């Protein structure tokens, strides 16, 4: 396992539509392990493959209650319900956080790290993570949802970003 460099805006890989993972082989397993280690090292809540420079449809995130890593390969959001205002940050946009609207409940489908089909229904922070990380795969960042510059805030030197928004 290795800690990979996290890409930051304006790196082009963050704005590209990622390609489907064609097969789950040893290189994908290594990428998954590296992404989990990188996410944990950066104290992030989630990470998408483009954030480590790999344009593939693969995301990892930590369950807030268990801190266990969840892996979704070729994820697709199939249902969104409700809305809630959230504060959100991104490891690829360091030093800032924004206020935006996300779904209260999100259902996504994809494959787990072993290639088994899975479906995840998340509420609250898990729904937010599913939306945020899956959008990375289409080149969409949370800042694209901000309605005005007033919704983007710089993190001061003494500010600590809440764990649930370090995505």
From Swiss-Prot:
EC number: 3.5.1.88
Keywords: Hydrolase, Iron, Metal-binding, Protein biosynthesis
Domain of life: Bacteria
Keyword Protein biosynthesis recorded: yes
MF (Gene Ontology): metal ion binding; peptide deformylase activity
Cofactor(s) listed in the protein's UniProt record: Fe(2+)
Co-factor: note: Binds 1 Fe(2+) ion.
UniProt cross-references to CDD domains, sorted A to Z: Pep_deformylase
Record: residues binding Fe cation: 90, 132, 136
Catalytic residues (positions): 133
InterPro entries from the UniProt entry: Peptide_deformylase, Peptide_deformylase_sf
Pfam families: Pep_deformylase
Biological process annotations from GO: co-translational protein modification; translation
Known role: Removes the formyl group from the N-terminal Met of newly synthesized proteins. Requires at least a dipeptide for an efficient rate of reaction. N-terminal L-methionine is a prerequisite for activity but the enzyme has broad specificity at other positions.
Family: Belongs to the polypeptide deformylase family.
HAMAP family for this protein: Pep_deformylase
PANTHER family noted in UniProt: PEPTIDE DEFORMYLASE (PTHR10458:SF22)
Name this polypeptide is given: Peptide deformylase
Biological source species: Dehalococcoides mccartyi (strain CBDB1)
Gene: def
